[in-house]
Swiss-Prot record:
Organism per entry: Teredinibacter turnerae (strain ATCC 39867 / T7901)
UniProt protein name: Phosphate acyltransferase
Key words of the record: Cytoplasm, Lipid biosynthesis, Lipid metabolism, Phospholipid biosynthesis, Phospholipid metabolism, Transferase
Pathway(s) per entry: Lipid metabolism; phospholipid metabolism
Family assignment from sequence similarity: Belongs to the PlsX family.
SUBUNIT field: Homodimer. Probably interacts with PlsY.
Catalytic activities: a fatty acyl-[ACP] + phosphate = an acyl phosphate + holo-[ACP]
Length: 330
């Protein structure tokens, strides 16, 4: 990375507040010496967290007194929060002063501000949220994850094109694409899914592999999984909930009695490695595909390492010219 990359950060977004964002930012800057950050938020809080850091010279802090609430409607945020940390962070990218924006704040508001300030490519009605998920064969990309609750067949085809472009950046030469559906039979699915499948089969640049069911999502049989935002968001959050339940119930079982505690001492190192490999923080940082510049959504409840990974995702997307590649595919 020879050219310095400038990231714009909404430091007030997310559940943990600005201190976690600053700690993650400092760790990120140590890993990526050719980057600099501009953070928007409460100046006093940001300055206190940055004070004494060896990376302070590569961090610009800008005061904003307004924040976007987690439950605020997107329309309200557009009308009333134009001085917020989120708006200012997105605006810095829209005006070309920064290369990418990262926020862990309100997804709907962030998407609306991205569309308003950065704009989508011609023909793209709404961006799609896309991120990698761990699978038995490495990882797959899934989109949309909540930006578009109801999608036309044409939108699903657009998602397939954009997801394929992102997958190619990560080394998938001819990425396979599947539609998430209630069955693998050609006759099953809603009208929009069946129409999208027909269009994808005939499309010259989509390597369509048919349908994938929910239980096959983590088998890694395809590179890109396409669905509407309602299905995608529910599937992702159910998966996170099941994973958390399994981990907590297993820990409880291993503490249940003395025999289990002894067994736990034996298997604990293996379990730690397994949990670390599939930790959602490793895959944090969702791309908002279809915008003319790079905008990355961090999970609001992520930890320090997770937010750091969202910053890494932003750098990867800028370095690979993702928006330009998306435009070429549409």
């Amino acid at each position: 990375m020879s050219q310095q990359i400038h990231l714009s950060i909404d430091a007030m977004g997310g559940d943990q507040g600005p201190r976690l964002v600053i700690e993650a930012s400092i760790a990120f800057l140590k890993r990526y010496p050719h980057t600099r950050l501009t953070l928007f938020g409460d100046f006093a809080d940001l300055e206190a967290a940055v004070k004494g850091s060896v990376c302070a010279s590569r961090m610009s802090l800008i005061q904003t007194e307004i924040t976007v609430a987690a439950d605020e409607r997107a329309g309200s945020a557009l009308r009333h929060k134009q001085g917020s940390s989120m708006w200012k962070a997105v605006e810095l990218v829209a005006t070309g002063q920064a290369d990418a924006c990262v926020s862990g704040g309100n997804t709907g508001a962030l998407m609306a501000m991205g569309r308003k300030l950065i704009k989508t490519f011609p023909g793209v009605s709404r961006p799609a949220i896309c991120k990698p998920i761990p699978t038995a064969r490495g990882s797959s990309f899934i989109l949309d994850l909540g930006a578009n609750l109801n999608c036309s067949a044409q939108q699903l085809v657009q998602f397939a094109l954009m997801g394929s472009a992102l997958a190619r950046v990560y080394g998938r030469e001819n990425p396979s694409v599947a539609l998430l559906n209630v069955g693998t039979e050609l006759s099953k699915g809603s009208e929009s899914i069946l129409t999208a499948a027909a269009l994808m089969r005939e499309h010259p640049t989509i390597n369509f592999a048919g349908f994938v069911e929910g239980h096959g999502l983590y088998q890694g049989e395809v590179d890109v999984v396409v669905c509407d935002g309602l299905i995608g968001n529910v599937a992702l959050k159910v998966s996170e909930g099941v994973a958390a339940f399994i981990a907590s119930s297993l820990k409880a079982k291993l503490r249940e009695n003395r025999f289990n505690q002894i067994a736990g001492l034996i298997v604990e190192p293996l379990l730690r490695r397994w949990m670390a490999a599939y930790n959602p923080s490793n895959f944090n940082g969702a791309a908002m595909l279809g915008l003319q510049r790079t905008l990355v959504k961090s999970h609001g409840g992520t930890d320090k390492f997770g937010f750091e990974q969202a910053l890494v995702a932003a750098v990867d997307q800028v370095s690979a010219n993702i928006p330009e590649r998306i435009a070429q595919c549409l």
